[in-house]
Amino acid sequence: MLLSLAPGSFIQGQSKKLVKRTNPALVAKDTSAHAPKLLVTFVELGSVKCIPCKAMQPVMRSIEKKYADQIKVVFYDVWKAEQQKYADQYGIKLIPTQVFLDKDGKEFFRHEGFYPEEEIDKLLQKQGLKTRSGG
C-alpha cells in the first residue's frame, strides 16, 4: 500500500542506524492465521514537489511490488500542512528521509537523501525479506 501524501532540503546519501523510536500506528497487526506477515514498514518522508523525493517514487513502488505482503510502504508529504506533524514525529532534518521500522514498529534504520533501490534491497534482505521470485 503506497500512500501519497505531498516540499525541503536535500543532502545526498546519509545513513544512520538504530534509532529507538516506535510508531504504534504503523505496527503491522496480524489478526488472523492467514494474514500476510509484514516484516518491515518503509516510511518515506518527502514531498511531491522535491526533485530527489520525486526520484524516490518509482523506487518505493518497485520495493512495494517486489516484497509484496512482507512490507508496508508509507509516504508522507511533509510540505503539506496536514502532514507536517510527521516531520516532527520522526525528527527529520531534510528530505527525502527514509525510515525503516521492524514488525514491532521499532526503527532499525534511517537514511537521508535519495536511496538507491539496490541499497534498499540489501537492507531488506538482511532483515529476512524475500523478493516475490524468492531471491
Model-derived segments and spans:
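Thiol-based oxidoreductase modules, predominantly thioredoxin-like and allied folds used
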Residues: 45, 69-83
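A short beta-strand-turn-helix
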Residues: 18-40, 84
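Short pre-active-site segment immediately N-terminal to redox-active cysteine/selenocysteine motifs
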Residues: 41, 46-49, 94
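The canonical Cys-X-X-Cys-His
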Residues: 50-53, 98
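Typically the conserved alpha-helix immediately C-terminal to a functionally engaged Cys/Sec
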Residues: 54-66
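Non-catalytic, surface beta->alpha helical segment in thiol-disulfide oxidoreductase systems
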Residues: 94, 99-135
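N-terminal targeting signals for export/organelle localization
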Residues: 1-25, 135
